[in-house]
Amino acid sequence: MEELRTYLNQYFKINESEWNLLQAIIQNQKFDTKQLLVQSGQVSKYIYFIRSGLLRVFHLNKGKEISTYFACDGQFISTFESLITQKPSTEYLETIEATEVYAISYKKLIDLYEQNPKFEKIGRMLAEQNYLCIKNRTYNFQTQTAKERYLEFINTYHQKIIQRVPQKQLASYLGIEAESLSRIRGQFLIT
C-alpha cells in the first residue's frame, strides 16, 4: 500500500496513526480484464485507488459506448456522481486490463472523514481535481478540433495510458469515429 501512501503524502503528510486508520478500511481487490465494477442502475459503493491496471468510465448512448474517463496506476477512480449522491449510476466502471485496486467503501470513507479532518481535506482536494478535469474536458470539447483534443489527451495522459487504451474506446472519448482517430494518429506517427 506504499503507492497510496506516497500519493497522499504529496498533498498532506500522513502520520502513522492516520495511516493506520486508513489501512483499516482498505480492501485489496483484483479484477480480470473487461470486468464491470459498477453497472448503470447500480449505486457506486466504492472509490478505488489503482495499484496496477487500467480502467474506464463509460455510458451508453443509443447502444453505443462512450468513454468519459480513463485511469491507471496511481490514480483514483469511481463513478463519482453515483458515489457522492448514493443514487443509481448512469455510467459503467470497467477494467480494460487485469487490475489491482485498493477499495474504500463510501460508508467507511464518510466515517473516516468524521474521525479525522485531514482525510476530509484530502477528499475535498480529490473532488476539486475531479471537477477541474471535467471542466477542462467540457471546455476542450467546445473549443478544440478532434486533432487538438487528441494532442491534449497525449499531453494529459502520457504514453502510459495511450498505448494501452483500445482505439475504439479512445475515439469515443475524443468524440470521433475510430477511423478518424486512425487518420489523426497517422499524421503524428503515433500508434
Question: Over which residues does each language-model region extend?
Answer:
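Short beta-strand segments in beta-sandwich/barrel cores
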Residues: 27, 54-59, 76, 100-101
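Glycine- and acidic-residue-biased ligand/ion/polar-headgroup-sensing regions
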Residues: 34, 45-56, 73-74
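Cyclic nucleotide-binding regulatory module and flanking cytosolic helices
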Residues: 1-27, 82
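Short phosphate-coordinating micro-motif centered on Lys-Gly-acidic
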Residues: 37-42
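Phosphate-/nucleic-acid-contacting segments
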Residues: 144, 151-191
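Cyclic-nucleotide recognition modules
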Residues: 66-125
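Alpha-helical bundle regulatory/interaction domains
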Residues: 19, 93, 108, 118-135, ...
